[in-house]
Design a protein with these regions (language model features):
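Glycine-rich phosphate/ribose-binding loops and adjacent secondary-structure elements
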Residues: 1-84
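C-terminal extensions of enzymes
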Residues: 87-157
Length: 157
């Protein structure tokens, strides 16, 4: 249902089908991978997702951060020795700079593709874990709105 249809149509179908699904069973949506689509689907009762976006984007030098997307092949990162996502606790952000990752990508070193993919997988794990925590606190809708405003504003691809 999620592959090829406009997002608004997908959301409409989710809203229609949600009441028809068993309450105690997990709800899976295939092929949904943008942060916006994932959070909007969670809002509509979806529990699980899978998509190629984290790996495909990583193989193309694009990484997801809590502030937005980055295209690390861009020349603007050639002398940027800061972390991809300051304060994000994963191996990529702790150990590699934007400039170093850009260098790896531009010389065709496979490590660069792997590190970008690891960053993206870490980001999406953080996104869903944080969404779950915000649901438990009763503040999901406010957090989602704040996150998406910040994230979509900073799409640096």
């Amino acid at each position: 249902m999620a592959v090829g249809e406009p997002a608004e149509e997908m959301y409409r179908i989710l809203e229609l089908s949600h009441p028809l699904l068993p309450e105690k069973k997990p709800r899976y949506l295939m092929g949904v991978g943008t942060p916006e689509n994932i959070l909007n689907a969670i809002e509509r009762g979806i529990d699980m997702f899978d998509c190629v976006i984290p790996t495909r984007e990583g193989r193309n030098g694009r990484v997801y951060t809590r502030q937005g997307k980055m295209n690390l092949r861009s020349a603007k990162y050639s002398a940027d020795f800061s972390s991809i996502d300051e304060g994000f606790d994963n191996d990529v952000c702790r150990n590699y700079s934007r400039a170093y990752l850009r260098h790896l990508l531009n010389v065709g070193e496979l490590l660069g593709l792997k590190l970008c993919t690891l960053q993206n997988i870490s980001f999406f794990m953080w996104l869903t874990a944080t969404a779950r925590a915000e649901i438990q606190k009763g503040s999901f809708m406010e957090w989602k709105q704040d996150f998406l405003e910040r994230f979509n504003y900073n799409d640096n691809t």
